UniProtKB/Swiss-Prot annotation:
Subcellular localization: Cell inner membrane
This protein's name: ATP synthase subunit alpha
Gene: atpA
Residues bound to ATP: 169-176
GO cellular component: plasma membrane; proton-transporting ATP synthase complex
UniProt family annotation: Belongs to the ATPase alpha/beta chains family.
Predominant localisation class: membrane
Amino acid sequence: MQLNSTEISELIKQRIAQFNVVSEAHNEGTIVSVSDGVIRIHGLADCMQGEMISLPGNRYAIALNLERDSVGAVVMGPYADLAEGMKVKCTGRILEVPVGRGLLGRVVNTLGAPIDGKGPVDNDGFSAVEAIAPGVIDRQSVDQPVQTGYKAVDSMIPIGRGQRELIIGDRQTGKTALAIDAIINQRDSGIKCIYVAIGQKASTISNVVRKLEEHGALANTIVVVATASESAALQYLAPYAGCAMGEYFRDRGEDALIIYDDLSKQAVAYRQISLLLRRPPGREAFPGDVFYLHSRLLERAARVNADYVEAFTKGEVKGRTGSLTALPIIETQAGDVSAFVPTNVISITDGQIFLESNLFNAGIRPAVNPGISVSRVGGAAQTKIMKKLSGGIRTALAQYRELAAFSQFASDLDDATRKQLDHGQKVTELLKQKQYAPMSVAQQSLVLFAAERGYLADVELAKIGSFEAALLAYVDRDHAPLMQEINQSGGYNDEIEGKLKGILDSFKATQSW
């Protein structure tokens, strides 16, 4: 059989038309060492900092060290079966987590995968865990309050929307309790909450989730979990993942509150990763960039202006500002606030709530030390009534603490000093509050009004608690409209002052406690 040149060219054309080739450029490398969740890879020439590297078994690692002839990466997840010689690939993507309203009411891990047994998460898309914080021009000053429901905090150390307020103290001083109560108090405020648990026991987190559910706050909250048994990489990344979920609400003109519990454990996880990557250690064996670790996270908590929100949503949301308020928690050792990580975070944040173990052990809970606790920007966000009534409280407590120290050495005290000591003791007693019992602005205002106007003068110290409980029950029963008005407006004028005075006069005349 003889083919002529025309037939041959036709056959070749047909074969060329049928030929289908899909070329994929894979940047592939080989694992050369595996140690404690850190792998060293040879051959990834075009790898980026922070890039996800695909490992065998549908797992990923993140590239953190880019060296001349190798890449150091941390494995996200189990690593026991990884071995030298295994092939890995670059993905060309950085780590992203699911974001959106579908995450509210769910418990997820660092990567956004559900761990609460309630099925898949309904998300609105993905966001990169690392993001640049809004610039100065995109921000707006803090002038709206976040009510924690604690008299001691809302009166003396007020927190505003978009603020970063550090909660610092030794272990077992009520840091998590304060943060959880702040979340519970946002049930009806419209503020979405994110609770990031880093390096805690799974049983502790389970209790927190159960309490949030009991008090009707879980539906408004995303819980991000990296337990103590998980890899250091997941503990290090958990706060950034939670922050990305919070930014979803901030950038769409809504308000969000995020709790990092706690950043001390994140710093320890990062130290572990850095030492395994053979980065040079510095003070307390932390790497040189441990300040940047926290500053780039906490700077993302901000109040953004309406122009930023409008530009981000492409005009869908107009005239609304957004905010992400951060309450990072730091655990100190024996009250040492001058250690490396505590001083770093104190310098980054807009104030701190210092909880003292000796106050906690003395039964003063929340164990807030008003002397060294401060809110640098929250004063502008305080409601008018709280600002008016709380000024005298801080002064009374400061004078009381000074006189209490002095009175230990003086046997005979004049009447004025005795009155100040008595008033200070009663204010201290009044600021005590049970856990899971946050108070509204109106309730706090009434109690502070009673303290400031001398209505506690003839009340025995032991009966302050029952006096407060009876007073709140009385106003809820007989003066609910006024309480509602104060909660809605937060205003203070002669009329409201007169009504509060009338309530306290009639209560003391007709009620018992």
